[in-house]
Regions:
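FIC/Doc superfamily catalytic core
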Residues: 1-257
Length: 257
């Protein structure tokens, strides 16, 4: 019998109510604006806003206008490529998560890494990446592979935990493990967004969760650090913060402004 590793995390103090409140914020947005009236242009705009926010969190200096004109730097261009396939990749995430994550890296790092490094999970013979400022050192390759494999297996199993909780854990694990040579932050945030789509939180991708994380950027690295080193207290705090980011992401939807 498989173990539901996500359900106990959803039961940490305050997490269930925070996840419900964030889900309500998204539901209200979709209900008030009319889910059936959401066009592809609104999805494209939301994804573009998310790409800019995610790239900015990774250190991009490109402006929203440069992103729109296709004149952005490598980080922002990679984030835009991610958005181009996010909706197609989302349905595959529960069946083949590792393949989705490696594809996300291929897209994100096309301008940042050599071709043979695209979609490549690091080994013990390679340097440990340090591409998310403010985090403690990433674990060695053996621990990374063990945890990433466990995460992938758990994603394919049924869970009673809210999709928001699962998405936040996936985001944090990829960011903390840094399984790729580069662009791990972009991949982590895109993986979270994919799950929010796949688990039906925002099936038409008109919210901007990356924008929510950007609004809360002052606590982004510290939140991930606490997740990595503070045990269940750090996990709880990260989950609460992620629920707040999703709520703010709903407020940043092009359906609002």
């Amino acid at each position: 019998m498989s173990v539901d590793v996500f359900e106990p995390l959803a039961g940490l103090e305050g997490v269930g109510s925070a996840a419900a409140a964030a889900r309500d914020a998204v539901d209200v947005l979709l209900r008030d604006r009319g889910l059936r009236r959401v066009g592809s242009d609104m999805t494209a705009e939301a994804l573009l806003r998310g790409a800019h926010a995610s790239a900015a969190l990774a250190g991009s200096t490109s402006t929203p206008d440069e992103v729109r004109r296709g004149a952005a730097d490598g980080l922002a261009s990679g984030a835009v490529r991610l958005t181009g396939e996010l909706m197609a990749l989302a349905p595959q995430l529960d069946k083949a998560p590792v393949q989705v994550w490696t594809r996300l890296h291929q897209l994100a790092a096309a301008d940042l890494s050599d071709e043979d490094q695209l979609g490549h999970l690091r080994t013990s013979r390679e340097p440990v990446p340090d591409d998310i400022p403010g985090l403690p050192p990433a674990p060695g390759a053996d621990e990374m592979w063990e945890r990433l494999s466990a995460l992938a297996q758990n994603l394919t199993r049924p869970t009673k935990a809210p999709g928001l909780v699962v998405a936040a854990i996936v985001h944090a694990e990829i960011a903390v493990l840094r399984p790729f040579p580069s662009a791990n932050g972009l991949v982590a945030r895109a993986a979270e967004h994919c799950l929010l789509v796949a688990r039906g939180i925002d099936p038409v991708a008109v919210t901007v969760p990356e924008g929510g994380h950007y609004v809360l950027q002052a606590s982004y690295a510290s939140g991930l650090t606490d997740y990595a080193v503070q045990g269940l207290t750090g996990v709880r705090d990260w989950l609460l913060r992620s629920c707040e980011a999703v709520t703010k992401g709903a407020e940043l939807s092009p359906l609002v402004s």
